[in-house]
A protein has these predicted regions:
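Conserved catalytic/coupling modules of large nucleotide/cofactor-utilizing molecular machines
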Residues: 1-102
Length: 102
């Protein structure tokens, strides 16, 4: 991984973010299996905003860990009722991560 520019790693993890949060749905989860257009639009805008930002990472592991945490929080939002207390809690955690992060 040291031979690849950090920008490639960042781009890769941004594509993983889109894949895991937007393109994949969990058919076994009652909430994620059926996603209304309003929620899809909301989540897509959030993901695109994250992907539009430039980040600074010291190394590949930092980049990977950051995006894995972002993906996890967004997936937890996908499993929560839209705009519920649980959903908003995950959103706040994500906001904190993004503001404290890179």
């Amino acid at each position: 991984d040291d031979g690849v520019p950090m920008s490639y790693h960042e781009l890769f993890w941004k594509s993983e973010l889109v894949d895991f949060v937007i393109l994949q749905q969990d058919a076994f989860d009652d909430i994620d299996a059926l996603c209304p257009i309003e929620r899809q639009s909301y989540m897509l805008e959030m993901v695109l905003d994250i992907c539009d930002k430039d980040y600074t990472f010291e190394n590949y592991e930092e980049c990977r860990n950051f995006f894995k945490e972002v993906i996890n929080l967004l997936r937890q939002m996908n499993y929560s009722e839209f705009q519920s207390e649980k959903f908003e809690n995950y959103k706040q955690q994500l906001t904190n991560l993004l503001s404290n992060g890179n």
